């Protein structure tokens, strides 16, 4: 059981981090700032596609271990879905020194309240919680957005609102 958790949460090595940065085309500084986070997100969006082919066509359980995600996204230059893309991006952010956690989220369309089925990243910078999502196959904020519950936020001309999950 301990080996499963070790594989899922294994950090990226320095070499893996550098290869990941080459994959997304990032050559900037390695600082844990909001500006660097925004640039990393932008590079990731431009280089790694959302894809869910394995979920529907591979007929196998997804392997969300760091090594498997690294091989698929960096080595094999594929994309992935939220648990894969945000999962590996979380490790990249931690390698940069960001304080961040993966969180479950739900996508609300109209009045329908679906169960939480999406993974996002919450990054803490200067006492603020920032929303980060590089793994959604639809419109998302292209840069970090401060999480302020029940307040409409704008990013790149689109409006977003965060809720604590209450009805």
What are these regions (language model features)?
Residues 2-19, 23-24, 28, 49-50, ...:
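His-Asp-centered catalytic microenvironments across diverse enzyme cores
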Residues 54-57, 67, 86, 117, ...:
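General N-terminal targeting signals
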Residues 8-77:
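Secondary-structure boundary elements
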Residues 78-103, 121:
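Cysteine-centered nucleophilic/redox motifs
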Residues 63-64, 93, 116-117:
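Short amphipathic alpha-helical patches
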Residues 58-61, 91, 110-112:
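Short active-site-adjacent helix-start/loop capping segments
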């Amino acid at each position: 059981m301990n080996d499963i958790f070790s594989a899922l949460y294994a950090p990226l090595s320095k070499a893996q981090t550098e290869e990941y940065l080459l994959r997304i085309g990032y050559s900037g500084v390695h600082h844990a700032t909001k500006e660097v986070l925004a640039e990393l997100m932008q590079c990731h969006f431009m280089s790694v596609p959302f894809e869910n082919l394995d979920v529907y066509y591979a007929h196998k359980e997804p392997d969300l271990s760091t090594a498997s995600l690294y091989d698929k996204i960096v080595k094999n230059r594929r994309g992935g879905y939220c648990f894969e893309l945000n999962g590996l991006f979380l490790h990249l952010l931690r390698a940069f020194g960001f304080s961040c956690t993966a969180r479950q989220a739900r996508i609300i369309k109209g009045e329908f309240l679906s169960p939480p089925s999406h993974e996002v990243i919450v990054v803490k910078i200067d006492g603020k919680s920032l929303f980060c999502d590089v793994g959604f196959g639809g419109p998302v904020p292209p840069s970090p957005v401060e999480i302020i519950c029940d307040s409409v936020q704008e990013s790149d001309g689109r409006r977003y609102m965060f809720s604590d999950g209450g009805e």
